[in-house]
Amino acid sequence: MANLPILQFEEKIVETVEKNSVVVIIGETGSGKSTQLSQILHRHGYTKSGVIAITQPRRVAAVSVARRVAQELDVPLGEDVGYAIRFEDRTTSKTRIKYLTDGVLLRESLSNPMLDDYSVIILDEAHERSLNTDILLGLVKRLVRIRASNFKVLITSATLDGEKVSEFFSGCPVLNVPGKLYPVEILYSKERPVSYIESSLKVAIDIHVREPEGDILIFMTGQDDIEKLVSRLEEKVRSLAEGSCMDAIIYPLHGSLPPEMQVRVFSPPPPNCRRFIVSTNIAETSLTVDGVVYVIDSGYVKQRQYNPSSGMFSLDVIQISKVQANQRAGRAGRTRPGKCYRLYPLAVYRDDFLDATIPEIQRTSLAGSVLYLKSLDLPDIDILKFDFLDAPSSESLEDALKQLYFIDAIDENGAITRIGRTMSDLPLEPSLSRTLIEANETGCLSQALTVVAMLSAETTLLPARSKPSEKKRKHDEDSNLPNGSGYGDHIQLLQIFESWDRTNYDPVWCKENGMQVRGMVFVKDVRRQLCQIMQKISKDRLEVGADGRKSSSRDDYRKLRKALCVGNANQIAERMLRHNGYRTLSFQSQLVQVHPSSVLSADNDGMMPNYVVYHELISTTRPFMRNVCAVDMAWVAPIKRKIEKLNVRKLSGGPAPSFKVPEEKTELSKNNAETPAVSENVESRIEAARERFLARKGQK
């Protein structure tokens, strides 16, 4: 700790903070800014008048850095030093240094808009430009004006454009803290490899066999790539002749790992042993692993993108930016001179890579953020004129307003509703919050809590969800898991949790059915916390258990599907008349298909349900709806009329929308463009016929 570069600047930092409300600190990776800034300010009395909050874009970083600071101060984690992430709070009234995700701090501001528990807020890793951090920048800018006498803000980053942020905060000072970096030799490949996984494997084994000691850090795009490469590395290392090279330990590192597996990478290896660390971009800046001498950079990152005109998400493997490439290379020079093997030519780096990463606010859905800003209900905050460091497009803001209008969170004039305020109390995406509120009204809250918790899981719980269709069919034949009774994936998720609940949460049941034990335990904990939140607004007394370990009935399924329809009013699709393709309703209409992993059933004629809701629209080989559930025409008709009456001009002052409908007719549109309300009795008869058919198929 004594050698960390930032400690040499302690006096200068304290002096600058004392004289200024806002300070930008640019510290190279490994300079110690994440762990030491809070301790520096603590030593100089800033915790006497409040708590020091340090935000992180990633949960993993918030937990690991808090743990490290607690160790350095020799205090129990959760007391003087603690952390808060979604669904987990390890702080007490004694906590003086608090690490938390940027999203948690935003939620705290709903109940305490002045954030007056905090004397200092440090926005760390601001260069990642997460959506929540960008909103916090605008929020703390406002607070600095109001709380200038007792409030300090530090924005810290490894690569941020300091002058741009300084200008945003009216010319605040920028301090540069150099890191302790050794020279790093950059080695480029002659061309892009056909497979960056196989190329990474070859380079890693060559280093292991030929190069002197030093750990190897390999950057992959995501968990799937990491698991494939870890498996291949283990296989290759075992095949090496005994005594031909040193021993090896191979560690994966990504956000979905349990904490006890994440912290392993910080333990030094045994003597004469090399560590292979296969990581996502979390190891670029958020976490520093000592001992790395060799870096293998695939040149790719997996990035979630959102198209506001179609409402479609895509998880794309894209090229990294120059800033990211430089950060990755720098990880090799932390302890001694190192090498970075770039699996791409110099020309690609020079000509193809963007200079910096596109901010998340310009490539994601803003519905949750707009609801948050509206729920603050502050007269000086206008969502369309909010002070962003980089403003989102007007199309993205209008899309967010439309989404919120369809689920009743705002009215036709763009004002937040009573339902919208209740939704903002829940730490969930808007569609899930709205589903819970509707379930509370229709009498299926217990079931909805289960489904929402299952959808909030950090990883894919069901192995079949990510399998190709042929493998999935084989898995389905072998599986004893419930099948959703023909209604689709949400009902299956409910049935799975209820089956596990009836075993008293036996981990053996999870393993026997191919379920992730850790993921299911997470779901149980999330459900319990959501249940506690919903107690405040529930009509009836809630029980955390799944209805006394009883299975839900078909009437429960019907109520749940209706609640899902209301909560996902902007995520409804209508089947085409002559085939099982669907078209989306609430966005610019487009043809989509049910994802092959879905358990949604066709009827006796091979036709899928007329209407479905989906949790997510993704683009892979083609547009797919994922997590799909059948809903009834009677529930869809009023939503469709609301869509057709939408006037974006009233919501935001923007241009009126236009919805393009494919020429091929759908079930609802074939008879009448202006659809009357559908009788519940008629719908019930259709439902009864469908249930008789499903019973014949043995799906009850």
Swiss-Prot record:
Gene Ontology cellular component list: spliceosomal complex
Lineage: Eukaryota, Viridiplantae, Streptophyta, Embryophyta, Tracheophyta
EC numbers, comma separated: 3.6.4.13
SUPFAM superfamilies (alphabetical): P-loop containing nucleoside triphosphate hydrolases (SSF52540)
KW Methyltransferase (keyword) present: no
Protein name: Probable pre-mRNA-splicing factor ATP-dependent RNA helicase DEAH4
Gene3D superfamilies assigned to the protein according to its UniProt record, in alphabetical order: 1.20.120.1080, P-loop containing nucleotide triphosphate hydrolases
Domain Helicase ATP-binding: 14-178
Extent of motif DEAH box: 124-127
Binding site for ATP: G27, E28, T29, G30, S31, G32, K33, S34
Disulfide pattern: none
N-acetylalanine modifications at: A2
Keywords: Acetylation, ATP-binding, Helicase, Hydrolase, mRNA processing, mRNA splicing, Nucleotide-binding, Spliceosome
PANTHER family: ATP-DEPENDENT RNA HELICASE, PRE-MRNA-SPLICING FACTOR ATP-DEPENDENT RNA HELICASE DEAH4-RELATED
GO molecular function: ATP binding; ATP hydrolysis activity; RNA helicase activity
Sequence similarity: Belongs to the DEAD box helicase family. DEAH subfamily. PRP22 sub-subfamily.
Catalytic activity: ATP + H2O = ADP + phosphate + H(+)
Annotated ranges, domain Helicase C-terminal: 200-377
Region (Disordered): 463-486, 654-682
SMART domains in the record: AAA (SM00382), DEXDc (SM00487), HA2 (SM00847), HELICc (SM00490)
Chain's role: May be involved in pre-mRNA splicing.
GO BP: any one term: mRNA processing
Pfam families membership: AAA_22, HA2_C, HA2_N, Helicase_C, OB_NTP_bind
Record-linked InterPro entries: AAA+_ATPase (IPR003593), AAA_22 (IPR049945), DEAD-box_helicase_OB_fold (IPR011709), DNA/RNA_helicase_DEAH_CS (IPR002464), HA2_WH (IPR048333), Helicase-assoc_dom (IPR007502), Helicase_ATP-bd (IPR014001), Helicase_C-like (IPR001650)
Organism of this sequence: Arabidopsis thaliana
